[in-house]
C-alpha cells in the first residue's frame, strides 16, 4: 500500500495541492463546509427521529431533504478530502486518528442511511426502536466530529 500512496503523492493533482498554500486553504475550507452540511443535516434528521424537533412535520418531510443534504455534504467532503489526502497520502494513511475518522465516516453514513430507509419513515409518530437508532446514529456522527477535530489539531 505504501507504494500506492507514494505514487498518489507524485500525481499532478497532489503536487499542485502540496505546492499551493492557497489551494490547500481553499480545499480545507470547502471540506469543512461540506462537513458542516453533513453534521447539521444529520443532527436535524436524528433529532426528528428522536421526536425532539419539528413536531408539526412528519419524519419523512424532514428526512428526505436532510438525507439529500447529507449526500451533497458527503460528496463535497469526500472530493475535497481526496484532494487534500493526495498531497500527503503516505503520512496521512499511517495516522491512526485519520484511520479512525474514515472508519467512523463509513459506519455513521452506512448506519444513518440503513436506519433511514426503514418503513417507519412513512408512519406517523416515532417508534421506540427508531429513537434508539437515532441515538446510535447521533453518537456515531458526533464521534466522527470529535475525531475529525482531533485529526486537525493533532496532525
Regions found by a protein language model. Give the residues of each.
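Polytopic transmembrane helical bundles with strong interfacial aromatic enrichment
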Residues: 1-155
Amino acid at each position: 500500500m505504501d507504494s500506492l500512496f507514494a505514487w498518489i503523492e507524485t500525481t499532478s493533482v497532489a503536487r499542485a495541492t502540496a505546492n499551493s498554500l492557497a489551494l490547500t486553504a481553499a480545499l480545507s475550507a470547502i471540506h469543512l463546509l461540506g462537513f458542516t452540511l453533513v453534521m447539521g443535516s444529520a443532527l436535524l434528521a436524528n433529532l426528528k427521529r428522536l421526536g425532539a424537533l419539528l413536531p408539526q412535520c412528519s419524519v419523512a418531510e424532514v428526512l428526505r431533504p436532510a438525507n439529500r443534504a447529507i449526500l451533497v455534504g458527503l460528496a463535497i467532503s469526500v472530493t475535497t478530502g481526496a484532494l487534500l489526502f493526495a498531497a500527503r497520502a503516505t503520512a496521512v494513511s499511517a495516522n491512526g486518528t485519520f484511520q479512525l475518522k474514515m472508519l467512523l465516516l463509513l459506519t455513521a453514513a452506512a448506519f444513518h442511511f440503513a436506519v433511514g430507509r426503514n418503513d417507519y419513515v412513512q408512519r406517523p409518530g416515532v417508534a421506540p426502536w427508531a429513537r434508539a437508532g437515532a441515538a446510535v446514529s447521533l453518537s456515531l456522527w458526533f464521534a466522527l466530529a470529535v475525531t475529525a477535530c482531533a485529526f486537525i489539531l493533532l496532525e
